[in-house]
Amino acid sequence: ILGWDINRVLEVPQPYGGISRILADDDGGFRGFYEQTGVKPLLYPDHGICRRLSDRYSVPEHIRLHEAAVARLAHQWAVRLKRLGYDIDPELLRTAGLLHDIARLKPDHARAGARILRMEGYPVMAGIIQCHHRLEGGEESGLTERTLLFLADKMTLEDRMVDIDERFRQSAPKCTTPQARENHRLQYNQA
């Protein structure tokens, strides 16, 4: 319609609420039907947008350092698995790692962070980070972006990689209610 290279049109940034896809008739005419309103044309933001999102949602520096460490570890695993033929997107996983704790200071932060990313127009990333605190039943046996982010988070204490036992030993004293202790036990078993 505008003479743009169709192979590069997804590089055009759109604000939340923009239209990502317009369907045309077989003869090239516009039907007036569109899909994916409010969805960014790319699955994940670049690193500059990640920083701006972290700024917008007031993510403290110590949490950003943790997110960066999780992102590095998850990305390393994803690159190796991709080479072995697994259907994993290393850059999507790295970016999800950089934003997985965007709502860390809120209750039920994994779901709150997923809501933020959906609102910002990144529903695929939202689906990945909403499970970084606990996977859905049976999901822990697969190798997906969701399971890799979950495990990388469980093997990262603050901004350093640790084994799972140490990570859960260190976090256990923070669980002061029966529900928190049960959630901790379930996460440990999934990891």
Which residues fall in each region the model found?
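Histidine-centered active-site/metal-ligand motif
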Residues: 1, 38-41, 66, 100, ...
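Buried hydrophobic packing segments
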Residues: 2, 73-78, 113, 117
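Acidic, low-complexity terminal tails and accessory targeting/binding regions
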Residues: 3-51
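Hydrophobic packing residues in well-ordered alpha-helices of helical domains and bundles
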Residues: 14, 63, 67, 184-187
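Active-site flanking loop/helix segments enriched in acidic
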Residues: 48-67, 96-102
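Divalent metal-dependent catalytic cores for phosphoryl transfer on phosphate-bearing substrates
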Residues: 82-178
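Charged phosphate-binding loop/patch that engages nucleotide di/tri-phosphates or the phosphate backbone
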Residues: 178-191
